[in-house]
Each structure stands twice: as C-alpha cells, then as structure tokens.
From Swiss-Prot:
Keywords: Cell wall biogenesis/degradation, Glycoprotein, Glycosyltransferase, Golgi apparatus, Membrane, Signal-anchor, Transferase, Transmembrane, Transmembrane helix
Name of the molecule in the record: Probable galacturonosyltransferase-like 9
Glycan attachment residues as annotated in the record: 205, 223
UniProt gene name: GATL9
The family this protein is said to belong to: Belongs to the glycosyltransferase 8 family.
C-alpha cells in the first residue's frame, strides 16, 4: 500500500530537514555570515550578479583539523583532505556556489574539504574574477582555481542535441588528470547543477576495487542502446568494443576517480580517440557522455543510487518537471535542460526546485511570485512517482 501525504506536512518537513540537519551533525560548527552581498561586473559589462556571504562552517572538536589557524596554508596536495573537482563559469556560477554551500553545510568536517575549481580561459568572466567572487562568498574556503584551455578540446567537439552540451568546459572532466596538480591522486568530480544533502566524506570513502578507475551510480535497467546512433550499432566493428563487458548506463556528473590509474592508463587519450571517431562517423548525440560509456561502461565501481538522484532538469529538449527516484537521497542532480535557478527566476519552478533554493546565495533581484510556493502540489507521491530519467 502506498501512503499519500499532504505536501505541507511532508515536503515542508523534508525541506526543514535539509536546511537544519547540519546544526546537529557531529563535528560541525556554524558561524553566521555577514548580511552583505558581493558582486562582480566584468570588463565587457557582463554582470555576474551579487552573492551573499555564506555562513562560516568550521570543524568541531571531533574533527582532525587540517590547520591550526585560519592563516595556515592548506595544500591542494594534502591526501588527508576530501578533494572535490567542479567547473566554474559565468553561466553556471550560481549553481556552483549553491553546490559548494550545500557540501559545506552537510559535511561533518567542512574544513577538511578542498575544492578544485576549473575555469575556462575565455569565459566572459576571467578565472581571476571568478576566483575573487568565490573567495568573497566563502572567505575561509579551501580551494584552487585552474585554467582550462578550451583549444585543447574544441576541435574534437561534435554537435549535440543540446547546445549546452557542446560547451568546451563540459569536457574538462576528460582532462582532470592533466589539469589538477600531479600530487592529487584521487578526486570526486561533480557537475555544477547539484546539491549534496549528506556528508560528502561518505562518498569520498568509496573503495575502487580491482583495477577500476572510476566509481558512479549505475543504471543497468536503462536502454543502453539509445546512447549511440544506429550507425554505431550497424557498424561491423564498433559494437565489438563492448565484447566481454556488461555495460550499464552511468551519469558522469558524479564520479569518484583514481587519478593515479587514470594517468598511468592515459585515459584522456582513450576518450579523445572516440571523439575523433565521432568526427568522422556520427556514432552518438549526447556530448561528453558517450565516450565515457565506451571506455568505462561495464568496469565501473557501483555506488549507491542515493548519490545521484539525477534527471531533475527534465529531458534535453523540453526540460519538463521530473520526480525523484525511489529510495533515499544524498545528492540531487538537475541534469537535463531545466536548471532550478532559471526556473525559479522565471517564476515557473518545478516542485523539486524548492529543495535547491535554501542553498542559493544569489542576491535575488526578482521577487518570487506568491503563487509559486513550496506547497504548489497536493501530495508527496508527486515527488516520487516512477519516471524515466535517462
């Protein structure tokens, strides 16, 4: 029997849980931020908007502190830290800021997390401007900004079903072994359209067994054939690359990566090889995902689905509202066309977009419509109905 609950009691309780659970987490102390906003306008007049300074999340006594005081330098090479890699650009900046905020808020030891932020060389906002904005929003954050040279990959990119998937920065994950400091042996890669509502250390502690290079939630019930064109499957040789494997779909927006094995196996080159084949013969339509499936599918460390409740941005064409997968949630992912900050500002949010909103540090210039509230639908089951996320 499936119980149905009023939205006001069920989802409000869930939202309150997401907002306040860090206050009761082991080892975390929260110091309120100043109610001031930081903003940046780049030289060409592109306005990045204003962001409110985040509360300061500090380690509690239970944590093994990685620095004795705020002035101490925290090295990007420190293997005792949790290392998270994300991209940083003007278009998705608001999502990246919210993602970082959510991880700090829910981390058991927030000062033990180091963020490796990758910015495009020719973004409307320079890497320096983006770095300054991150520092102003999170004054005590452990992070480093790396510059991604877009000409590294731009000639390998083929057209996709959605223009956003053609952004060169979307391919930065292919080059993490080259971009990040050589001393970084392991990293969690996360897309910018996520929020984490659990302790990121739990994901970090994932073991990559055997010879596996990456770990990610797998979805073996998905129709794997649709990620490649009929030209791929009709080719006499190409489907044979899956021979001896049981390939399953996985989403590359959440991955635990062993960069030592990645570099040793030259996996960047393996991904580039498939991109070169794609330029000669169209074998897929979905941007940076299919090369990862071709190289890794069937040899991925399976991580609990709770760590990538993906597809919340809807499909790649309409961006329609989606429901949650069944089961517990540690990470919500707005993969697909629709992004929560865009839909909220346009006053047409999907129900789950309101779970992203508490982590948004953007200084809002658009007043939320009163009829677009957290209680815009009738039952919790509307959030958890079965639906296709692939």
């Amino acid at each position: 029997m499936r119980l149905r609950f009023p939205m006001k009691s069920a989802v409000l309780a869930f939202a309150i849980f997401l907002v306040f659970i860090p206050l009761f987490s082991v080892g975390i102390r929260m110091i309120p931020g100043r109610l001031t906003a930081v903003s940046a306008t780049v030289g060409n007049g592109f306005d990045l908007g204003s962001f409110v300074e985040a509360p300061e999340y500090r380690n509690g006594k239970e944590c093994v502190s990685q620095s004795l005081n705020r002035e101490n330098f925290v090295s990007s090479c420190d293997a005792s830290l949790v290392h998270v890699a994300m991209t940083l650009d003007s278009e998705y900046l608001r999502g990246s800021i919210a993602a970082v905020h959510s991880m700090l808020r829910h981390a058991s030891c927030p000062e033990n997390v180091f963020f490796h932020l990758i910015a495009a060389e020719f973004d409307p906002a320079s890497p320096r401007v983006l770095s300054q904005l991150v520092r102003s929003t999170f004054p005590s954050l452990n992070f480093k900004v790396y510059i991604f040279r877009e000409d590294t990959v731009i000639n390998l990119i083929s057209s996709s079903i959605r223009q956003a998937l053609e952004n060169p920065l979307n391919y930065a994950r292919n080059y993490l072994g080259d971009i990040l400091d050589p001393c970084v042996d392991r990293v969690i890669y996360l897309d910018s359209d996520i929020i984490v509502v659990d302790d990121i250390t739990k994901l970090w502690n994932t073991s990559l067994t055997g010879s596996r290079i990456i770990g990610a939630p797998e979805y073996c019930h998905a129709n794997f054939t649709k990620y490649f064109t009929s030209g791929f499957w009709s080719d006499p040789a190409l489907p044979g690359f899956f021979s001896g494997r049981k390939p399953c779909y996985f989403n590359t927006g959440v991955m635990v990566m062993d960069l030592v094995r990645w570099r040793e196996g030259n996996y960047r080159e393996k991904l580039e090889t498939w991109m070169q084949i794609q330029k000669k013969k169209r074998i897929y339509d979905l941007g940076s995902l299919p090369p990862f499936l071709l190289v890794f599918a069937g040899n991925v460390e399976a991580i609990d689905h709770r760590w990538n409740q993906h597809g919340l941005g809807g499909d790649n064409v309409r961006g329609s509202c989606r429901s949650l997968h069944k089961g517990p949630v540690s990470l919500l992912h707005w993969s697909g066309k629709g992004k929560p900050w865009v839909r909220l500002d346009e006053k047409r949010p999907c129900p789950l977009d309101h779970l992203w909103e508490p982590y948004d540090l953007y200084e809002h210039k658009i007043e939320r419509a009163k009829d677009q509230s957290l209680f815009g639908f009738s039952s919790l089951s509307e959030l958890t109905e079965d639906s296709s996320f692939f």
